[in-house]
Design a protein with these regions (language model features):
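Alpha-helical DNA-contacting segments of helix-turn-helix folds
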Residues: 47, 54-61
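C-terminal peripheral helix-coil segments that are non-catalytic and often amphipathic
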Residues: 83, 116-129, 147, 154-183
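Hydrophobic alpha-helical connector segments
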Residues: 56, 66-93, 104-108, 112-116
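Short hydrophobic/aromatic patch on the recognition helix
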Residues: 37-47
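Basic, helix-initiating cap at the start of DNA-binding domains
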Residues: 1-35, 52
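Helix-turn-helix/winged-helix DNA-binding modules
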Residues: 24-25, 45, 133
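Amphipathic alpha-helical interaction segments
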Residues: 11, 31, 52, 79-87, ...
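All-alpha amphipathic helical-bundle segments outside canonical DNA-binding/catalytic cores
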Residues: 107-111, 128-143, 161-165
Length: 183
């Protein structure tokens, strides 16, 4: 790929991430092209359609979440799961439009599976350390992330909740529910 083509592609992906994070599925490819300061033809040379661009953006988003899990794995076992879920919450809140449920089918399955595997290991480490209840399952971690996503979406769309960061309180409730009596 030519250098200018690579630069344009990177600009498009960065712009798409910002536009989709802000506007969610309502964003158009025209919005992305404008934000990237390129013409529509340049966008379509790089990405055949909106789904292709969304897949690329979601791949980057999931790679960052995997990086979060890798960092959390370096934390002590009693803190790793908390670090992971808190940082995922921050990422989801910062890029709320990227977590739109309608884009779930476009999420890159190998990256989703790696994220699940890593979050499961964080849970198992916390359970072995005695800080997470033994009956908490990997599905509970997934449900916690879905719940955060829902609260964050509500904060975006409901003026009564806008800007209150209720997701943080909700996460604290979830984390308390995950903790063992000893933790």
């Amino acid at each position: 790929m030519r250098r200018d083509a690579a630069i344009n592609r990177e600009r498009l992906v960065r712009a798409a991430e910002e536009v989709f994070a802000e506007q969610g599925p309502a964003a158009t490819l025209g919005d992305v092209a404008n934000a990237a300061a390129v013409g529509p033809a340049t966008l379509y040379r790089r990405f055949a359609n909106k789904d292709a661009l969304v897949r690329e953006v979601l791949s980057g988003f999931f790679r960052r979440l995997i990086d979060v899990a890798v960092i959390a794995e370096q934390s002590p076992p009693e803190a790793g799961l908390d670090v992971f879920l808190r940082t995922v919450g921050v990422e989801l809140a910062a890029k709320a439009g990227l977590s739109a449920p309608v884009w779930g089918e476009l999420a890159p399955e190998p990256l989703v599976e790696e994220l699940r595997r890593r979050s499961t290991e964080l849970l198992r480490r916390a359970q072995r350390a005695g800080v997470a209840r033994a009956d908490v399952t990997p599905d509970d971690i997934t449900a916690a992330v879905w719940a955060l996503r829902g609260v964050i979406q509500s904060e975006r769309t409901d003026p009564a909740h806008h800007g209150h960061e209720l997701w943080r309180r909700h996460l604290e409730t979830i984390l308390r529910g995950f903790r063992s009596a000893a933790g």
